Amino acid sequence: MQKKLFLTVVMFLIGMLMTGAYAQTHTVSGLVKDKEMGDPLVGVSVSVKGTKNATMTDLNGNYTIKTSPNDILVFKYVGMKDAEESVGDRKIINVLLVPNAESLGEVVVTAMGIKRQSETLTYSAQTVGGKDVNDIKSINMINSLQGKSAGLQITPNSTGAGGSSKILFRGNKSISGSNQPLIVIDGVPTMTNITGAQSSEDYGGKRDGGDVMSTINPDDIASITLLKGAAASALYGAVAANGAIMITTKSAMAGKVSINVSSNTTMETPMIMPKFQTMYGGGDEGTYSWGDKLSSKSKNYAEEFFRTGFTTNNSISLAGGNDNFKAYFSYGNVYSQGMTPENTYRSHNLNSKVDFKVLDNIYVDFSAKYSNQYSKNQAAAGYLWNPLTGAYLVPRGTDWNYYKENFEVYDPSRGCNVQNWTNTKQQQFGNPYWMLNRQTPISERNRYEFGGSVKWDITPDLNIQGRMRYERGEDHFIHNAYASSVGDYYPMGRMKNNRYFSNQLYGDVLVNYNHTWGDWALTATAGSSFTKTKTSHVDLWGEGTKFTSPAGAGNVYYPNIFTPNNYYKNMSRIFDDDAFETEKRLNAVFATAQVGFKEAVFLDLSARNDWSSTLAFTESCSFFYPSVGASVLLNKLVPMGEQVNLFKFRGSYSIVGNDVPIYMSNLRYRFEKDSPGAIKAPDKAPFRTLKPEKTHSLEFGFDGTFFNNRLDFSFTYYKTNTKNQFFSVSAPYESGLRNRYVNAGNVQNQGFEASVGWHQQFNDDFAWSTNFNISYNENKIKELVEGLENGLTIASWQSAKVVLNEGGSYGDLYVRQIQRDADGKPVKNADGKPVLMGDSMEDMKYAGNMNAKVNFGWTNTFHYKDFTLSFLIDGKFGGRVLSATEATLDGWGVSERTGDARNAGKVVVDGVEFAPQAWYTTVGASNFNSPYATEFYVYKGTNVRMRELSLGYTFRNLFGNGKNLTAALIARNLFFFYKDAPCDPDVSMGTGNGVQGVDIFNLPSSRSLGLNLKLNF
């Protein structure tokens, strides 16, 4: 009994002690923000003073830590002054950190993944946070950067979800090569293949296989650094001649386990549509709408055709670890129903990254990524294979619902269903529902990526690092067409089965040294890299000839059976001549060094030498390019007062090569498409004296921050000259070849980029941040190859072409025009129609340049307590837009203009009257291969729009301490403040050179409204 009593008393005393101990500790949570910017700070060190008890703020700036009333919390962050807060009985402690004017600024990820302080850079570089791409998401995340950086131009393809985008820094430089920048993920260059992007042709049906940006989960992105000039990206060599986009993905933070969930749902509707007449009916065998006036208005068939699109973008991530081991895992998926019926897109992304210490000075990391994309009925610009042609051109007064529900009928002569339409012989347009169900393009893409690195800190100043990454892409494209597709062109059907494989193995070794001697500092890196790229492409292609008898004459033995055996029996084209296998290798050595004096003067030197397999058969198999730059922090050399936090002048000069297209220096044999088993010899002479393109780049500018970092600005002037361009010219007759390659040409770009921002924290509850950026680019063709009397055509369509001439600019547009008399009035022929002039350069008219000279963006963000309001207005001035869609609507009599003209009974042009049908069937496009007066269908590209708008609220500690939910109403492409073109000037046919600003039945750009949810634990 006494023993039990003793144990009871002991347990009671222990319990009281423990209760007292626990009563002395409690959990403190809070939010840490930048006082000047108002933004949450990620990765702030929060510790209990004098102890090892510490944590870090999460991706939303929140923290949670166990404390006692007598404790003092210490908050530390790079570039900010330390802060201390006494705990007492407080359970929520929010902190505003003040920028440290004495410390160097933000860390910037530069070429090869080398991190440097922004103040030491000798060239222009801008870093944007992950919030810029995941607050208002785009399926292709690069589109979320539109208008947010000076000098960055992004033009999405008109192919809908999963499509690629044209990305351009500082104008077009290369005439025959790519003008896209290099994409770098975590310091390593990635494959940027775009498989089958739309080319510059009217017919269409080309596939947009997407780009690497469309495979990235935006919620995995920590930051993006834009290296716009050659000096910034020179260490990457030829592949980065057009600049580089450095993407840093998220990693786990030591001592913190976090779970983040994101869900973004939007509804999409067409932002802008053509205007149609609904008063005059069809005629001419169910093709055109030049018939009599209807007794009642017709439906707007285009509005009937489109539906409200739906997109959901979800992701979840788990991250955690300690000082010795950290891991990050994420999964993201996208599902989209497009604005056109039967159009779907889905994608899955898996990402994992682990890093750990092997020893105290050896660090290892591994990463693995997988993405899968699937699309069905992806839009394709052009006349053929495009359901929009039927939806737009169907004769007014047609029973739309009948053809929608009965898009096919049985044909006993062929023994199968065939297309049912107002005119089944017309190749240019067909029943859109037949196309969506019986000409269905299906695309699937898999992308695998495995990488790793090892870093050894030999001394505090010296380390060596090795990295390797393997990537593989697998693309499969099927586009089978059932019997009667494209009018009578494929009466028994067509098979197309395309497979494209790409592999890249990259590796490098870097030695890094960093040391300070008194006022002097040296940062140096030397290394070597190799890149091995291999691609293969097989295209099974079978097509039938015109149907000539009930027995099924033609090349297809049985209709609608899409197998090689069915085509083998009556073979026309079973292997496309584009079937190929390529392999390329690039080895390089490089070095860069920066010398600093008193943290105020910095000198940069870098050099790289490439050995490319594409130059193996030339007189020189390598090319060398250097760069030099300097920056001076004037505020550290000259007293400027406390209001000047930074005033820096910088300048750089560099020479960067642009790699040579594969097989240009050596003969290449190919399969002959029209003779199975035969080999086709090349018709171009090998380029044995080949030299790589070289871009000479000069830039200088200044950066500044004032008034305790409230005001910041940046200005850069640049000038680039790209020489040794590649041209194909006629070969001497005696050579037996048709063409030969030569080096020639000089394309110059010069202009400026500027940005200014103001960041004001009015009080603890209210903050405002605004930024305005603007860029100007002037392009000039200084030299072309000799003997081009009529210039060089880089893109052409029916009655229009883009031509380069010495003294002209990249993107100069020439169009067909009507004949005029001495007084400038239109000339009539005997039939009362205008007279079209020819399509020679002497007859065509210069219509302006398709590229805008000025681009701008203006961002505003307001924080009030837990509310956040932000919007982006952007636009461009200049440029021209060509709309073959409008020309065709006129030629077919379905545009609003043609209806108004018939109501008026005439068309008056410069004082000359024409009958509406006589005028519009001549100047408009009455068939996809008929000439028309393109001069009337060129519009100004200038436009200003509300690009983004969001209003959000953060529910703090909703599910416990530090567990927050942020909900935001979001909108994208809301409306135009100004626009001249009848289509979206920023949507293009493809990513190739010279096809931006062209509308040939492009999918309308979308206006999206939705909800974004973010939950963090």
PLM regions: where:
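Short aromatic-centered micro-motifs
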Residues: 34, 46, 75, 183, ...
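Extracytoplasmic gating/loop element in the C-terminal half of outer-membrane beta-barrel translocons
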Residues: 612, 876-966, 970-971
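Acidic, glycine-rich flexible loop segments
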Residues: 311-312, 383-434
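Short, small/polar-rich motifs associated with maturation and membrane association
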Residues: 1-351, 355-371, 449, 456, ...
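Extracellular/periplasmic, surface-exposed regions of secreted and cell-surface proteins
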Residues: 180, 291, 309-312, 347-349, ...
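Glycine-rich, aromatic-lined ligand/substrate-binding cores of catalytic
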Residues: 849-882
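Conserved small-residue
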Residues: 260-295, 538-552, 742, 759-850, ...
